[in-house]
Amino acid sequence: MSSVWDERAEAYRTSEAHREGKDLDLLVEWSQGAKTALDVATGGGHVARRFREAGLEVVSLDPAAGMQPDVVAPAESLPFDEGSFDVVACRVAAHHFEDVRAAVKEMARVARDLVLVSDNLFAGEEAEEADRVRDPSHVRNYTEEEWRSLFAGAGLDVEQVHTYVHPVLLEPWLKRSGCTGKDAERVRQLVAGRLDGDRVRLERICLKGRKRTDG
């Protein structure tokens, strides 16, 4: 799978949909006061970039070497000691994880204080089919309740949750994952009810979790 992401690396680095966003601003806001951070599944490196601009010492991590991370490793097996970073963040990547529960537990393990996650919300099976057809590396989006359970199971207390509508341009969304021909037409059919002009309405969730301390 990493070879697929190596091929997509430049598209994600230059993607307007990934370079900016309310969730990106929120992750930076929530990390105020932290000194060190880990950006899990960094992709185009946008969280790492914004964290560095905010003055944090950042390590970026991704399973695909083509994304040019500081460390090449999967989210489910982070090569760091417990409590290595003040904050661990993961933006719009968890829906690709084969074992999201293990990944959240790993993020909590290497975090000293905070785990911050943003991702697209589960919007029904039709939306899931559209995501899988558009991008076969898609595993699943999760509901707010599922995210809260994942955080709790990793020893994280959810302090803040923010959800919002995140519109993305349809055709660049398809192109970014190499979706063409009949597959692209099928996706257009599946998302027809979520279109506002040339944009698809996605729902996004951001969660701020604080690591529990004994006692």
Segments the model singles out, each with a brief description of its role:
Residues 92-93:
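Short catalytic micro-motifs in class I SAM-dependent methyltransferases
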